[in-house]
Structures are given as structure tokens and as C-alpha cells.
Amino acid sequence: MTAPEKPVKQEEMAALDVDSGGGGGGGGGHGEYLQQQQQHGNGAVAAAAAAQDTQPSPLALLAATCSKIGPPSPGDDEEEAAAAAGAPAAAGATGDLASAQLGGAPNRWEVLSATPTTIKDEAGNLVQIPSAATSSGQYVLPLQNLQNQQIFSVAPGSDSSNGTVSSVQYQVIPQIQSADGQQVQIGFTGSSDNGGINQESSQIQIIPGSNQTLLASGTPSANIQNLIPQTGQVQVQGVAIGGSSFPGQTQVVANVPLGLPGNITFVPINSVDLDSLGLSGSSQTMTAGINADGHLINTGQAMDSSDNSERTGERVSPDINETNTDTDLFVPTSSSSQLPVTIDSTGILQQNTNSLTTSSGQVHSSDLQGNYIQSPVSEETQAQNIQVSTAQPVVQHLQLQESQQPTSQAQIVQGITPQTIHGVQASGQNISQQALQNLQLQLNPGTFLIQAQTVTPSGQVTWQTFQVQGVQNLQNLQIQNTAAQQITLTPVQTLTLGQVAAGGAFTSTPVSLSTGQLPNLQTVTVNSIDSAGIQLHPGENADSPADIRIKEEEPDPEEWQLSGDSTLNTNDLTHLRVQVVDEEGDQQHQEGKRLRRVACTCPNCKEGGGRGTNLGKKKQHICHIPGCGKVYGKTSHLRAHLRWHSGERPFVCNWMYCGKRFTRSDELQRHRRTHTGEKKFVCPECSKRFMRSDHLAKHIKTHQNKKGIHSSSTVLASVEAARDDTLITAGGTTLILANIQQGSVSGIGTVNTSATSNQDILTNTEIPLQLVTVSGNETME
């Protein structure tokens, strides 16, 4: 049902039939008033018209009608009909509005009966006709007249005495006009045919459109665009469209929970104060470059020195005149860096004398050597200190030098880790510890650069420049050295090798690795070297005399020679001597207990006078362990055999993760070849290599059996050298000692097979060391 477009006239209200129901549903064609659906003759209409003419108003007619009691007379038909029409209105005045109709002027309402009407039949009797719209209970109320009024309605079928009210269906059509002149229509949907609201669903539909139209449908359509369904109770506040607001409406603010990271604050973009954030609109970006010396050169742009002391609460005035300020400065960096400093021999921190001096706070210096945090200092300021926090916090007292100008000056702030500077002295005056005060900085907003350098103990300097944007307050900031320094060693220029003493002990001397004149490098001095696992690499001019002891293995022959195809490098043989000694002396040295030869102390040697059973033969040593009876020709062999019985193994392999122990030194050296893969014994026929000499002897017999030549006519070349006796030259060649089996050494690379006896060849005297050169591409097995 739509709202009435004009008030109901009294003439039209009098034309209604009082006997018909007045609560019928109105549509768009008859929305001006509530129309009765039944009329019963011209007599009733004429009676109602005459009654309306005789009374001044319908309310007076109702009052007069209610006062009459008794059956009506035939002459008063018109008045009784009018009174019958007004009787229900009197009942409705008590509060039952569901049984009445409203009508009248725009500023007042008239009660129209919606109860059963009473008419006369042909016989003259009064007959009540029930109304067809008594169950609808709908009302049409204009909104402009209900601003300050309260309406109480009782639906038909409810009991107003006990307070029980059945479901009431009503319909309100507000008229809202948007900013652009369009009308916003609010439609209500329900389950009934008359377009009322279902209180169970409580759904409100807001339908925008170009004109005001009521969409009265039972259920909302799902395909209607711009239809916003909202369940539950909704309070519609003010809506602002296009930047305009309606009178009497407030702005709607909605809080929507979002899953965002912490420490995020949403600020309206129009209400952001750049000065409160330390960013001034007049600040300029200072760009700079770095020259070849590592200094920062300014391009000449100025930085705004706006004063924000009132907003931030921090004193950043151009001049520092107070002496009791307490402000700690921490400078944050994500990488390892120190502020630029220099250190003299006395350990006092020296500072560059360059300063940025202007009265207006602008930077005019063309050469900024490591100066990007400026602090204007007045004449009264004695000295300041700055606390630089690193991985190991150290309080640094810095030296600030004042320039000759009496005006406010920008001083260079410098710091270094890990040293602590105790002596603080300003230029031209002595400062006591009581005059020290914490540094207070004035930083211009905008972009500036900080150039940091790392000072090494040797005086080398490495530079690092990083950019800081939009920083104004540097309090409670901290430098953190997170990245470790990388030490780079230059190629070796001078090398001093250790010496091998006559006793076989390795005497280490300090090895100095000089870096020369290369920048950004440190000098490293090695004070001690472990003799285990060290390879000597002498250069061309290396002069390192060493006495190398060559041990003779038991199953090998006692003579040394050079192979026929060997070559020698005479530059590598300077001052090198070799001495062939007995294994007993080597055994005594390795054990470290005996310094000279002693007689055998086994029970058989003591009881038998030191000889075996056969007096004419060579001395023999028999094992005294019952059931053994092994015979040895040397006491060292017997002692090694006795260690095998007792389980003593004093010779330990020093190879990484090995640690095997042996009773004999030759067993240990043979075991070492398994780690190094060295095969020292070479076949002269096929150049095949073997680790053990007995394996080589068996292999040579195969060649002798094929050729049918006696073994005494062949020249056997055996290369034997311990791993420590192998020398690797700078050219990549390997020098090994050669074992002479037959003949004598008469020249480099030649073998003389004369009939000289072996005893004349090999003596305990020192002979020049002869080396075999193995090319670098030949594999040493």
C-alpha cells in the first residue's frame, strides 16, 4: 500500500458507505484514502451526507451519536446511520486503533471505522454486516507528521487488557535523497501478500534507483543488482556520497579486523604531519661521490636545518651552550663499520680538522673527508664523548677539535672499535674529565651519507659508504658489527725455511709473509710451525743447509747407485750432504733413549759370552723366549723381536685418523707408503714400481728367467727415500735419493761397473748427495 498523496476531504469521507469495511488494501490507483469495498443503496449515502451537513465536524457527530440510547425511529434513519458509523470510532478512541480508520486534514487524523457496519433491511430492522478487511490491520502514515509523535496500535485478535499482542504488520516508506538528486528507496519484504515485514526474518533491502518506487514482493530476488541484504537489527546512520553529507547525519566509521603483521599503524593520509615524523617538505637530498682516496666529495646541495625542538622534545638548536646535557648517541648500521678515525703512535684518537662551518646550517665544504654527522659546537663546549656500541660495547672518548672561527661550527664525529681512547684533548686547550659531556647532534632532515672506515693494527684503512634517508633523531641508536673481517694474504715474497738438524729434529724459524705495498691487506707473521706435515718449497735463491739422515732397510742391499737415465739439477745439490748409517744408530735416535751402541743384554748373550754356538761365524743373537728360538744378526733386530713378544709398539703412525702402532720403524715407514701411495722401487726393465724391495726382487727374477741372464750381471736401481726426505723444487720436480747396488759413482748420471769392492765404496764418511729428478707429469707411486 502506498502513502496518500493528498489529505482525505470531508466530502469524500461522507460519501463512503458506513456499512462496508474500511481496512481494504489500497494500491497505486486508490492510495489517497482507505475506500470501503461495499455500498448498500442511495438512502444510506444520502443519510450520511445529511448528517455531515448538520454537524460541524465528525468528532462532534461521534460525541452526539454515542449519547443516544434506544431503538431508532423511522424518522431518524439518517442520524442513526451516522451514529452507527461513529460508534466504533468512540471505541477506537480508547486505544483500539485496529478497529478504526484515520482521516482528516494533513495535520490531524480522523478515525474511520473498520469494524462491522449496521444498516437497515427492507423490514426496517438493523443488520450488522462484517467487514472484509478486519484481519488486515494495515495503516498508511505520512513520515513528515510522525517525527515527535508516539503511536500505539493493537492488532485485531489481540487482547489489550492482558497485554498480549499478536504479530503486527506495518509498512513505512521513508524518502531519502542522495547528493546527486537521486532518491534512495528502502523496500521491506515479507511473507504476506500485502507487502509487510516478516518479523522472524527481519530483513531490510536498500534499492537505489532514479525514481521513488516501492517494490513489494514476498521474497527478494537473488538476481537483483545493487541489492544489499542485511540480517538482524541494522541501524542506518548517515551516508556521505561524493564528499557531501546530509544534515543531521554523522559519518560512519567501520572497524574491520585484518590479518596484518605487528607494529603497523594506519594513519589517514590527509592528516599526516611530516614534521612530526622528522621529514620536512623543504628538506633536500645531499648527494655525494667518492674520490680515489676514499673521501666523500659533496656536490654542493644544501640541507635544510629546520628546528623541530618543540614537536619532538629534543634540543637540536644550532648552538650547544648547556654543559649538563645527558644524551647518549647510538648509531645503527647493519654491516661492520666504524666511523672514520686515525690513530697515532701514542694511541690517541686523532681527528681530521675539516669542519662544516656555516651559520645557516648549510654545507659548503667541497671535500668531506669522512664527515657526515655534524654537530655545531659553541666556544663554551669543552669536549664531548660518544658511546658506540658494538658486539663488545666499549665507551669511546673522542677528540673534537674546534676550528678558528668563533661562530657555530659543525664538528666531525669519529669513532673506532675495538680500542678505547682515554686521553681527550681539544686543540688549543686542556680538558679535564669533569668537563666531558655527552654529545648532542643536530641532524638536518633529508638524505645524507655516512662514510665508515676500518683501521687495522698495521695502519691499513678500508672504506665503506652507506646512505641514510629521512633520519632526524639519532638517539638510542647503535652500531653493530655483524660481518667478520676477511683477511687476504698476498703471494709470498720472502720465505725463510726451517732447518733439519743433524739429529733429525726439525728446528722451525719464523716465516714472514710480506704483503708489500698492496692496499687493504694485513701483514701476518707466523711465529711457530709444526714439523708434522710440512713440505719444504725452496725457491731459486733459497739457501737452507740441512743434514739428511738416510736409513737403510734390512732386506735391501747395502750399496747405493744412480739409475742410468736419471738427471740432476746442480743448483738443488748445494750444501746438501748424505751420510749412510746403520739402522742401530737410527733406532737409537728414534727411541730417544740410547745415544751410543751398547751390548746385547739378552740372557743368551750374557750366558754364552756374547756369541752363538759357532765361534767361527758371525755373531748371532738368539731369542730367549721358550718355544721361539729365532736368530738375528743385529741387536736392534733382536730388540724389535722382543717388543713383538711383549706387545710393545712404540712407533705410531701420525697420519690423520690413523694412529696405528708398530714394533719396528721399517714397518712404520712401509705403512706410510700405503697412505701416500708411494712406490719407490722401480724395475729397470719395464719401469714398474713397487712399494717393497722384496716385491721388486721377485719381479726382477721373472725378467731373468725370460732372458736367461744371471742376476749378478744386471744393474738394479732402487730408489729409496723417506717421505720427509723428498724435496719438491719450485719448478715442480721431485728429487729423490738413489740407492747404489753395484759399482761406484764417478759422474752425474753415469754408473761405473768396475771391480771395486763394495766395502771400498760405502763407508761411514760423507759423500755428496746425488738426486734423481722426476718430472712433474710423472706419477709418483
From Swiss-Prot:
Transactivation domain (Gln-rich): annotated span: 138-237, 350-499
- GO BP annotations listed: B cell differentiation; definitive hemopoiesis; embryonic camera-type eye morphogenesis; embryonic placenta development; embryonic process involved in female pregnancy; embryonic skeletal system development; enucleate erythrocyte differentiation; granulocyte differentiation
Record's keyword terms, sorted: Acetylation, Activator, DNA-binding, Isopeptide bond, Metal-binding, Nucleus, Phosphoprotein, Repeat, Repressor, Transcription, Transcription regulation, Ubl conjugation, Zinc, Zinc-finger
Q: Which PROSITE patterns match?
A: ZINC_FINGER_C2H2_1 (PS00028), ZINC_FINGER_C2H2_2 (PS50157)
Specify the cross-link site (Glycyl lysine isopeptide (Lys-Gly) (interchain with G-Cter in SUMO)).
K120, K551
In which tissues is this gene expressed? Ubiquitously expressed.
The UniProt record lists the Glycyl lysine isopeptide (Lys-Gly) (interchain with G-Cter in SUMO1) crosslink at K551
Record region (Disordered): 1-53, 65-88, 301-338
Q: How does it assemble?
A: Interacts with HLTF; the interaction may be required for basal transcriptional activity of HLTF. Interacts with HDAC1; the interaction deacetylates SP3 and regulates its transcriptional activity. Interacts with HDAC2 (preferably the CK2-phosphorylated form); the interaction deacetylates SP3 and regulates its transcriptional activity. Interacts with MEIS2 isoform 4 and PBX1 isoform PBX1a.
Q: What is this protein called?
A: Transcription factor Sp3
Species the sequence originates in: Homo sapiens
Q: Which gene encodes it?
A: SP3
